[in-house]
């Protein structure tokens, strides 16, 4: 498709094509532009505060594009499409002698029609502009307010304590090598191989080979070690490292590359001990917060895929170097890296353009496991270091889902198990030892706090727990970084350091669950305006109502709808797999991923995010994808196992299944329109079910519709919650 790109006009709102409920850009965006060290007559100088980053860019560049090029992480949920309003900035006014700049509102182009519409609808205070719409006309200082900065998210993905049988693919072998003899003409490498075969017969499994750098260093290393050396033998036949004398420790790294966060666990390849764990935001987030925004960025910006690949490789290098420093090692001690990630991350990691994943049939370039040199990816570790990437299952069910399956092993259990990795794109596996099915469900970023008016990532100041009194509708809550609840002594003083900044993803699940249990929202998701008689926290919000948790944190009707849409997509996904399996119930539920770790299973079930089952059979498994990566790092048999298992998993494409939409509509109700959630009701006191007379009521925008008959469906009341 040929796409025009205006050079000096604000980008028009992009036309959108819907693929499996994802929005994919096929309309115009701004040019790819680079920052220059020397300023030309057509360039402007831009300085960002508080980061202090600055550079020269061509006039007509948008502020957001300049920020991306300079590495300033301005929040942009929609990927620069003028849809979210998260990328607000303020142009500095006055003379900035330090930078040699006189900055003002006229340093940016005129306010666009898109900004005017946004300001009329949601407001732009204090001279703020949308950075994705603001064109640079002159030298300028740009202030990025805290709410527009990508928060320093808490990456809570610690390694679990599961026991892993050690059978690493790389092993250390100390060998004594015969010195050269004038009467026996043999090369040093041949004698090294002979010594290795003789002294380590249980570890040598084939004809020994080596990398070129080993041949180049074998003679000086043998002599430095006085004919005693340690070699690292990979897969029983390939020498990838050699050191003089005794080398006691080498390391490997298991890395889970998520679309939002990345986590790494550095392990001792001899003992299996976790030496260090590090985590960070995925630096690709500046190109778009959800996966399809990044695919779109690559489509609309020539070389955008390479730009995103470079960003994530740089992020991986930072993680590895940080973990090595924590462990008291160097990058050269790292000989093995195992990676897992969703299909888009998987492709970008390998330098593969993910454009084909942007539309049906969502074709993968490769679905088998991949094994390459670390140097081929530009990762700086030991010269013999290798990277192993777990296989993808299909389409939008990636290597991270394979890692979850490896760690949780539903294929080894006779019980029917649902494994779900909740994220921007939920990956779902249902099955047991007889059969397994997998699907992806486009839940969107609402579960991570995006699309929520007070939503944010899990950072200090974010509400993560809440309880609402059913009689007074008064909330009590906890925020990340503060030990006390809001009604406890010392909270007000402790929270001053961070403030109450918003609601994180796991927190919004609990907030809506409590609002439903307290009667603030009805079964069809409407914020009940009649409850305003009970509490001033419920106020009119245009034609709907909202609930105030604190002075600056509010839950609106649109927030409720965003979660309804996300949870309905999740329910429809696993229900579709249950239909294919011809089963009516799930025996156990495994919530994978860092987000799943922090969801209270009760509230996930109250909202209908997971199927009805005994609450004690719902388990938060933590970062199972990372655990699977660690298993593949420390046990080569685990690699063979998952490679075989994924071939037997049946992939169901939700986009072409007629029943998906029917399940989706019914799942919009809380917890569900037709499923009574009887097991949950036996443990949690649920509100009285009020059903409409129609089989499939329209649920739009939270507006009450006239002429709808409502019937009451009593439900057995359990003990007090």
Task: Give the ranges of each region predicted by the language model.
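N-terminal phosphate-binding loop and adjacent alpha-helix
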Residues: 283-325, 451, 460-469, 562-565, ...
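Nucleotide/phosphate-binding catalytic cleft detector across ATP-hydrolyzing
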Residues: 25-26, 30-36, 42-44, 112, ...
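Local cysteine-cluster metal-coordination motifs and their immediate loop/turn environment
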Residues: 73-114, 120-139
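Glycine-rich phosphate-binding loop of actin/hexokinase-like ATP-binding domains
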Residues: 255-259, 264-292, 355-369, 403-406, ...
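Catalytic phosphate/nucleotide-handling subdomain of diverse soluble enzymes
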Residues: 432-437, 579-646
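A contiguous, well-structured pocket-lining segment that forms one wall/lid of small-molecule binding clefts
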Residues: 516-571, 575-581
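Short glycine/threonine-rich loop-to-helix capping motif typified by GTGT followed
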Residues: 341-356, 583, 594-614, 654-663, ...
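Glycine-rich phosphate-binding/hydrolytic loop that grips phosphoryl groups
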Residues: 379, 392-407, 564-568, 618-655
């Amino acid at each position: 498709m040929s796409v025009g790109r205006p050079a000096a006009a604000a980008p028009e709102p992009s036309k959108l094509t819907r693929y499996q409920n994802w929005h994919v850009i096929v309309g115009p965006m701004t040019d790819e532009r680079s920052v220059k060290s020397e300023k030309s007559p057509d360039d402007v100088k831009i300085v960002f505060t508080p980061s202090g980053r600055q550079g020269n860019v061509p006039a007509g560049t948008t502020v957001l594009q300049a920020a991306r090029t300079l590495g300033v992480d301005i929040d942009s949920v929609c990927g620069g499409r003028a849809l979210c309003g998260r990328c607000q900035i303020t142009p500095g006014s006055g003379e900035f002698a330090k930078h040699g700049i006189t900055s003002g509102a006229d340093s940016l182009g005129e306010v666009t029609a898109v900004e005017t519409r946004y300001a009329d609808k949601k407001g732009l205070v204090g001279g703020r502009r949308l950075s994705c719409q603001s064109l640079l006309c002159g030298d300028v200082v740009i202030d990025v307010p805290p709410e527009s900065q990508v928060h320093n998210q808490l990456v809570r993905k610690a390694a679990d304590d599961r026991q892993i049988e050690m059978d690493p693919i790389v092993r250390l072998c100390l060998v004594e090598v015969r010195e050269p003899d004038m009467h026996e003409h043999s090369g040093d490498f041949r004698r090294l191989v002979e010594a290795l075969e003789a002294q380590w017969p249980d570890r040598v499994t084939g004809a020994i080979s080596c990398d070129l750098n080993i041949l180049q260093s074998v003679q000086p290393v043998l002599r430095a070690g006085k004919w005693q050396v340690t070699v690292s033998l990979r897969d029983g036949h390939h020498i990838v490292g050699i050191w003089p004398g005794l080398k006691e420790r080498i390391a490997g790294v298991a890395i889970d590359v998520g679309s939002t966060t990345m986590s790494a666990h550095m392990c001792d390849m001899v003992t299996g001990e976790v030496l260090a764990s590090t985590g960070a935001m995925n630096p690709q987030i500046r190109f778009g917060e959800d996966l399809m925004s990044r695919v779109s960025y690559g489509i609309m910006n020539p070389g955008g895929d390479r730009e995103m690949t470079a960003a994530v490789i740089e992020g991986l290098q930072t993680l590895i170097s940080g973990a090595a420093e924590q462990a008291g090692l160097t990058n050269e001690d790292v000989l093995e890296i195992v990676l897992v990630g969703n299909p888009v991350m998987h492709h970008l990691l390998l330098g593969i353009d993910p454009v084909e994943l942007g539309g049906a049939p969502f074709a993968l370039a490769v679905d088998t496991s991949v094994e390459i040199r670390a140097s081929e990816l530009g990762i700086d570790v030991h010269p013999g270091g290798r990277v192993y990437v777990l296989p993808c299952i299909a389409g939008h069910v990636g290597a991270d889902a394979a890692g979850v399956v490896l760690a949780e092993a539903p294929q080894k259990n006779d019980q029917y198990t649902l494994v779900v990795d909740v994220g921007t794109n939920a990956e779902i596996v249902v099955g047991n030892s007889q059969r397994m099915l997998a699907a992806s469900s486009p839940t969107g970023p609402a579960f991570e706090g995006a699309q929520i008016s007070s939503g944010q990532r899990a950072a200090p100041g974010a509400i993560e727990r809440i309880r609402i009194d059913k009689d007074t509708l008064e909330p009590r809550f906890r925020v990340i970084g503060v030990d006390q609840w809001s009604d406890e002594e010392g909270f007000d003083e402790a929270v001053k350091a961070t403030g109450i900044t918003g609601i994180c993803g796991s927190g919004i699940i609990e907030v809506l669950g409590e609002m439903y249990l307290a009667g603030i929202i009805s079964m069809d998701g409407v914020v009940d305006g009649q409850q305003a008689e009970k509490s001033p926290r419920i106020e009119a919000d245009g034609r709907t109502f909202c609930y105030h948790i604190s002075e600056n944190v509010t839950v609106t009707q649109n927030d409720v709808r965003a979660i309804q849409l996300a949870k309905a997509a999740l329910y429809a996904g696993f229900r579709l797999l249950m239909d294919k399996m011809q089963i009516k119930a799930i025996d156990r539920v495994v919530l994978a991923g860092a987000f799943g770790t922090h969801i209270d299973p009760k509230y996930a079930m109250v909202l209908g995010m997971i199927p009805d089952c005994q609450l004690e059979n719902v388990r938060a498994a933590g970062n199972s994808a990372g655990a699977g990566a660690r298993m593949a790092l420390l046990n080569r048999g685990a690699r063979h196992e998952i490679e075989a298992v994924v071939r037997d998993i049946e992939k169901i494409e939700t986009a072409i299944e007629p029943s998906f939409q029917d399940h989706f509509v019914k799942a919009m109700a809380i917890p569900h329109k037709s499923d009574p959630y009887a097991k949950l009701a036996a443990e949690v006191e649920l509100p009285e079910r009020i059903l409409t007379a129609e089989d499939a009521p329209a649920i739009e925008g939270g507006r009450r519709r006239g002429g709808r008959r409502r019937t009451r469906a009593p439900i057995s009341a359990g003990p007090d919650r």
